[in-house]
Curated annotation (Swiss-Prot):
Signal peptide: 1-23
Protein name: ER membrane protein complex subunit 10
Cytoplasmic membrane side: 240-257
Function: Part of the endoplasmic reticulum membrane protein complex (EMC) that enables the energy-independent insertion into endoplasmic reticulum membranes of newly synthesized membrane proteins. Preferentially accommodates proteins with transmembrane domains that are weakly hydrophobic or contain destabilizing features such as charged and aromatic residues. Involved in the cotranslational insertion of multi-pass membrane proteins in which stop-transfer membrane-anchor sequences become ER membrane spanning helices.
Organism annotation: Danio rerio
Protein location: Endoplasmic reticulum membrane
Disulfide bond residue pairs: none
GO BP term (any one): protein insertion into ER membrane by stop-transfer membrane-anchor sequence
Membrane topology recorded in Swiss-Prot or TrEMBL: Single-pass type I membrane protein
Keywords, sorted A to Z: Endoplasmic reticulum, Membrane, Signal, Transmembrane, Transmembrane helix
Family, as annotated: Belongs to the EMC10 family.
Lumenal side: 24-218
């Protein structure tokens, strides 16, 4: 009887503990164990392709993948393949004839919620001199340019250093792994002209002129007391000169007779 009585007391306690553990396990910040993680950790990837040919005819192949992460600020990560021995030799041959090294990415939107029915809308291409890439030991900087809606509208690539100086490079040591810095550049909003303060200042000046009508008078209305005497003086002086000239002319004519 004693073991049965003890068991009857223990079972309710175990059931209560089990119930508490079950409720605590479901409390996961409003997200169940089967739900997806936050959108800040979700994303998508697009291929990064490159082409370097001696005949300068682009034939793109996979270089790596751009992995985009959603969130307040678009972030991008790049995973790249190593160059094979054949690719290293081809790249050096292209550099020897001053050929071009090209890259391209599809034109997509960086907004994760727009990737459900994503379709590529063409490609964006950039290039650099192959000799500059070789002499930089595959060190390049790739920048993706987006518009205000988040679509990729441009891509640029530069090497460090960016010039060709004819330096010999050991392909097995320096031409195997890319050293790439990649970033996303969004458009910068231009400063808005301060039209409101200008209009307010103009209205204040108009109000001041309305309160002081003396400032609204014309030039003649302000200085007529000086202009009129001057005009009369000039008129009188001109009349005196004409009368004096006529008298002198008559005397001269009379003396001639």
């Amino acid at each position: 009887m004693a073991p049965i009585r003890v068991l009857s007391l223990v079972l309710p306690i175990l059931s209560t503990v089990t119930l508490l553990l079950t409720q605590f396990g479901e409390c996961n910040n409003g997200r169940r164990s089967g739900d997806a993680v936050d959108t800040d950790f979700s994303g998508f990837s697009v291929p990064l392709e490159h082409s370097f040919e001696v005949d300068d005819v682009p034939r793109f192949r996979l270089r790596g993948a751009l992995q985009f992460r959603g969130g307040r600020e678009n972030s991008v990560y790049l995973s790249q393949n190593q160059l094979s021995e054949k690719d290293r030799n081809t790249l050096k041959d292209v550099a020897a004839v001053d050929g071009l090294y090209r890259i391209r990415v599809p034109r997509v939107s960086l907004q994760v919620d727009r990737q459900t029915e994503r379709q590529y809308e063409g490609y964006l291409t950039a290039f650099v001199r192959a000799c500059a890439l070789v002499e930089s030991h595959l060190s390049d900087v790739i920048t993706l340019h987006t518009d205000v809606s988040g679509y990729v509208i441009g891509i640029s690539i530069v090497t460090i250093p960016g010039s060709c100086r004819g330096i010999e490079v050991e392909d097995e040591v320096d031409l195997e792994v890319f050293n790439t810095t990649i970033s996303v550049m969004a458009p910068v909003t231009a400063p808005v002209p301060e039209t409101a303060p200008y209009i307010e200042r103009m209205e204040m000046e108009m109000e001041k002129k309305g309160k002081n009508p003396q400032e609204q008078k014309s030039f003649f209305a302000k200085y007529w007391m000086y202009i009129v005497p001057l005009v009369l003086f000039l008129m009188m002086s001109g009349a005196q000169d004409q009368s004096g000239g006529g008298a002198g002319g008559g005397a001269a004519n009379g003396g001639g007779r």
